């Protein structure tokens, strides 16, 4: 944790969830309506098909709602894409950009993610920008170089703690059950903080840095207690309210 920064736990449902999944969303909102919700912020990023119904479910609750990607243009001939303005109208407050699965499956570049981030801001959304290295890059001892390049290329100059959140997700740890050591996470987050302060000054010191990659109730305390880890980007464990809330509960004792 970073002193003075309110933690955030974000759930990424990926390509999972249909109407019945809103039961889990209601349970998450209910669990965070207690004193637990005063200890952290929470956001659930659902598939686009659920956004409007999820917004209705979360009306009056403290849980934020996010999309999982957005185009960099407001409208046009872009079949299958969704603009930030559309996400906002559907009830989103946040949007994940540059997730490793988008970078890999759709060959998204740092330049494209930078453009998407600016578009998200223009629509009034908070951008959750993801960075992280592959297994081969880590093996070649290039992890920090890759993270640095992604931070430099994916973040516009207008970054503030209000419009941007950074998520470090070592690609080799996503959905594999593998988790970096505490030392690895500490080194990556310390490096990111250093790079952000160097570029953005005091603003960089206040940006929230999330860790993402096989976060679950059994390892949450260890990971979320690391210096400069200001929360988590949770994948599979966010699909079940009990697991997501158990991760959030970690902040009662940190």
UniProtKB/Swiss-Prot annotation:
CDD domains per UniProt: TIM
GO molecular function: triose-phosphate isomerase activity
Active-site residues (renumbered): 99, 169
Assembly mode: Homodimer.
Entry binding sites for substrate: 12-14, 175, 214, 235-236
EC number(s) stated in the UniProt entry for this protein: 5.3.1.1
Keyword Nucleus attached: no
Protein name according to UniProt: Triosephosphate isomerase
Keyword set, alphabetical order: Cytoplasm, Gluconeogenesis, Glycolysis, Isomerase
């Amino acid at each position: 944790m970073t002193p003075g920064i309110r933690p955030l736990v974000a759930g990424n449902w990926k390509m999972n969830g249909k109407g019945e999944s809103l039961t889990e969303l209601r349970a998450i909102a209910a669990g965070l309506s207690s004193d637990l919700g005063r200890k952290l912020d929470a956001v659930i990023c659902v598939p686009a098909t659920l956004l409007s119904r999820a917004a209705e479910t979360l009306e009056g609750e403290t849980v934020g709602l996010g999309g999982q990607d957005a185009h960099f243009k407001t409208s046009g001939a872009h079949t299958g894409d969704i603009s930030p303005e559309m996400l906002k109208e559907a009830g989103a407050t946040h949007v994940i950009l540059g997730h490793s699965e988008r970078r890999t499956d759709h060959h998204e570049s740092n330049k494209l993610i930078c453009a998407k981030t600016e578009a998200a801001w223009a629509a009034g959304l908070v951008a959750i920008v993801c960075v992280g290295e592959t297994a081969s890059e880590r093996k070649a001892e290039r992890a920090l170089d890759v993270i640095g390049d992604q931070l430099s290329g994916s973040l516009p100059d207008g970054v503030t703690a209000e419009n941007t959140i950074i998520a470090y997700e070592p690609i080799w740890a996503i959905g594999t059950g593998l988790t970096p050591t505490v030392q690895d996470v500490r080194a990556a987050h310390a490096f990111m903080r250093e790079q952000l302060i160097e570029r953005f000054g005091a603003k960089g010191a206040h940006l929230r840095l999330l860790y993402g990659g096989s976060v679950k109730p059994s390892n949450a305390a260890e990971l979320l207690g690391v210096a400069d880890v200001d929360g988590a980007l949770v994948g599979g464990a966010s699909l079940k309210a009990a697991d997501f809330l158990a991760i959030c509960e970690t902040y009662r004792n940190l």
